[in-house]
């Protein structure tokens, strides 16, 4: 049997000229801004124009483009190798980005050429949110219908509590905790992408799933009297978002004089929100030598095993 696995991710601009259209695509998503047209269109135009210069400066810090596609390609290659250890099926992994290339329509054409017996949709978002997982799945389904991809399709919605996912995080955090312990008693900050409270109040389970991921990791770490906190980053605009912010928790740690081990709990690949926000902007808050940023899971063998098992064990 031939199986196509579609890895969903956010996407990112591949040049500075792509920054504004990328931002427009992001804010035009009705799962991000729930307004009817033409209001959503006009607001997306306004926000993308207003934020372009700020965003361009962020991408200039990391070579003028987002590394998310290259990082996702490494994950896709590792996953395809792992899946094809099972010789009963032939797996091919495709990457589909939500707000920049490769878009769903391009990917669907490639999938049609592969002609699979089954399609598996696998978002690179461990914790489910309507703004990420659901948005990607809905967009895929709409384009699959439009471009005539008729195939048995299965979906993976979440894996925030998967044993291998938890263990992969635990191992990385333990390594950096040990380094930080040489300075003092560390505080572990689990930083997740924030969401507006209005979305959470509508029943989005994202925050509760982030909390459960962290609970399981803390339990697995089994460190006596572990000092830890969940915090949220990447807030924009004046509305109320999930709190506390990562910045405020770093300022608290600075005031307390403790080393910080920061784990990007909701991110599985490196991009602007880790490489700039965490590694440059937030790092500057903490005293030199007191900041230990845990890398994203990327191609960690346990994480790749987690993804492969999710695909293989689908009913």
Curated annotation (Swiss-Prot):
Pathway: Porphyrin-containing compound metabolism; protoheme biosynthesis; protoheme from protoporphyrin-IX: step 1/1. InterPro entries: Ferrochelatase, Ferrochelatase_AS, Ferrochelatase_C, Ferrochelatase_N. Fe cation binds at residues 193, 273. GO terms for biological process: heme biosynthetic process. Signal peptide: none annotated. It comes from the Bacteria. One of its GO terms (molecular function) is metal ion binding. GO terms for cellular component: cytoplasm. It catalyses: heme b + 2 H(+) = protoporphyrin IX + Fe(2+). SUPFAM superfamilies: Chelatase. Keywords: Cytoplasm, Heme biosynthesis, Iron, Lyase, Metal-binding, Porphyrin biosynthesis. Its EC number is 4.98.1.1. It is an enzyme of class 4 (lyase). It is found in: Cytoplasm. The keyword Metal-binding applies. NCBIfam families: hemH. Belongs to the ferrochelatase family. Catalyzes the ferrous insertion into protoporphyrin IX. PANTHER family: FERROCHELATASE, FERROCHELATASE, MITOCHONDRIAL. This is Ferrochelatase. It comes from Wolbachia sp. subsp. Drosophila simulans (strain wRi). The lineage of its organism: Bacteria, Pseudomonadati, Pseudomonadota, Alphaproteobacteria, Rickettsiales. The gene is hemH.
């Amino acid at each position: 049997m031939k199986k196509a696995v579609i890895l969903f991710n956010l996407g990112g601009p591949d040049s500075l000229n792509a920054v504004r259209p990328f931002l427009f695509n992001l804010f035009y998503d009705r799962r991000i801004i729930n307004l009817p047209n033409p209001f959503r269109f006009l607001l997306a135009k306004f926000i993308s124009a207003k934020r372009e210069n700020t965003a361009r400066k962020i991408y200039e810090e990391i070579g003028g483009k987002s590394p998310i596609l290259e990082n996702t390609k490494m994950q896709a290659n590792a996953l395809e190798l792992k899946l094809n250890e099972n010789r009963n099926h032939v797996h091919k992994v495709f990457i589909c980005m939500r707000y920049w290339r490769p878009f769903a329509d391009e990917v669907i054409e490639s999938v049609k050429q592969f002609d699979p017996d089954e399609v598996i949709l696998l978002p690179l978002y461990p914790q489910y949110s309507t703004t990420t997982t659901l948005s990607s799945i809905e967009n895929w389904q709409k384009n699959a219908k439009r471009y005539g991809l008729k195939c048995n399709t299965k979906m993976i919605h979440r894996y925030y509590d998967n044993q291998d996912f938890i263990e992969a995080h635990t191992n990385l955090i333990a390594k950096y905790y040990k380094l930080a312990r040489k300075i003092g008693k560390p505080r572990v900050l689990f930083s997740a992408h924030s969401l507006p409270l209005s979305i959470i109040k509508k029943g989005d389970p994202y925050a509760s799933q982030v909390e459960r991921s962290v609970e399981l990791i803390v339990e697995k770490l089994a460190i006596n009297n572990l000092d830890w906190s969940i915090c949220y980053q990447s807030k924009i605009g004046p509305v109320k978002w999930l709190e506390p912010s990562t910045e405020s928790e770093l300022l608290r740690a600075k005031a307390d004089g403790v080393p910080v081990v920061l784990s990007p709990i909701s991110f599985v690949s490196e991009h602007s929100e880790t490489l700039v926000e965490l590694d440059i902007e937030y790092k500057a808050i903490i005293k030199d030598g007191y900041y230990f940023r845990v890398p994203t899971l990327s191609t960690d063998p346990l994480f790749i095993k987690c993804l492969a098992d999710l695909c293989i064990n689908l009913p």
